[in-house]
């Protein structure tokens, strides 16, 4: 497994040695320094860049998704290899499926791989599974993203119960494995990515049997910048997810906090070591 730590723009040096990156469309649209950094990263051999559509950030801010046509231009600015197709939290699966059928060919025509995020309305687990099944079997899709929002939504536990939220993606992966859909995805050459992190880094340990290829999160760096250290509790974060939204322009002058962020990154890097290595 490859892990994509995400850093605020003034601290991109923290992630410069990664071989896999997840970039964010809403930052690429506004920050030339950000784009220039990832243009340089693309020159490194065997570096992979997934450009997210910033759907999580736009949803939390109550803003609409980027138009797919604009995503192509932004992906070129950061030299991305894959584009996350627009996804729609708390919407029926067919909305995202229709967009995938419409826009995946255009993304491929421009030379990008395609990344699909299954979604459903809150409480509709079967529709979320249907959405995954579409991606697992459709040749238009290269990558499948397991969302930090979609899965807790499907189990009605996105807010108010950290334990249920922490376990929700583990439960979902077991469900699709039992139905043969995870194997179907692997048989069809799909890559599996985990988007974000919920209530502690030890979620990684729960997922080690599922053949996850890549995972991203800003949790290690952002928690560290705010004085929160990953710990030896069962989840790795005794009080659960640090809920304050990431400020991607934050400049941290206190070196103690920067070192704490590095400690948290090392905690995750040690967890992923040896998982699904090829």
Task: Describe every region a protein language model picked out.
Residues 70-73, 98, 102-106, 130-134, ...:
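Alpha-helical scaffolding segments of alpha/beta enzyme cores, especially the outer helices
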Residues 25-26, 86, 147-149, 218:
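Conserved residues at the C-terminal ends of beta-strands
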Residues 113-195, 199-203, 219-243:
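Glycine/Thr-rich beta-alpha phosphate-binding loop at enzyme active sites
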Residues 18-23, 46, 79-80, 110, ...:
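Glycine-enriched alpha-helix->loop->beta-strand junction motifs that scaffold or abut catalytic
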Residues 64-67, 92-99, 162-169, 174, ...:
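Residue-level preference for long, well-ordered alpha-helices that form the structural scaffold
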Residues 1-110, 276-277:
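Non-catalytic, usually N-terminal nucleic-acid engagement modules in DNA/RNA processing proteins
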């Amino acid at each position: 497994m490859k892990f994509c730590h995400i850093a605020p723009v003034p601290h991109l040096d923290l992630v410069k040695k990664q071989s896999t990156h997840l970039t964010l469309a809403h930052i690429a649209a506004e920050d030339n320094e950000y784009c220039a950094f990832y243009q340089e990263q693309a020159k490194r051999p065997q570096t992979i860049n997934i450009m997210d559509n910033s759907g999580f950030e736009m949803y939390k801010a109550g803003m609409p998704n980027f138009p797919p046509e604009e995503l192509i231009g932004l992906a070129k600015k950061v030299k991305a290899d894959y584009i996350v197709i627009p996804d729609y939290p708390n919407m029926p699966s067919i909305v995202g499926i229709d967009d995938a059928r419409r826009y995946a060919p255009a993304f491929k025509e421009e030379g990008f791989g395609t990344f699909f995020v299954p979604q459903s309305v809150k409480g509709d687990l079967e529709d979320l599974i249907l959405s995954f099944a579409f991606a697992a079997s459709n040749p238009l899709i290269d990558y499948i993203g397991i969302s930090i929002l979609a899965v807790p939504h499907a189990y009605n536990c996105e807010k108010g119960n950290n334990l249920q939220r922490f376990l929700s993606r583990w439960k979902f992966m077991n469900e699709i494995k039992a139905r043969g859909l995870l194997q179907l995805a692997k048989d069809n050459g799909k890559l599996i990515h985990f988007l974000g992190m919920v209530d502690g880094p030890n979620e990684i340990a729960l997922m080690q049997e599922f053949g996850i290829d890549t995972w991203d999160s800003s949790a290690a760096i952002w928690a560290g910048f705010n004085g929160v250290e990953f710990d030896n509790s069962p989840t790795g974060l005794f009080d659960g997810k640090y809920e304050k939204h990431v400020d991607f322009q934050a400049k941290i002058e206190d070196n103690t906090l920067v070192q704490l962020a590095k400690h948290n990154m090392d905690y995750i890097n040690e967890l992923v070591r040896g998982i699904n290595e090829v």
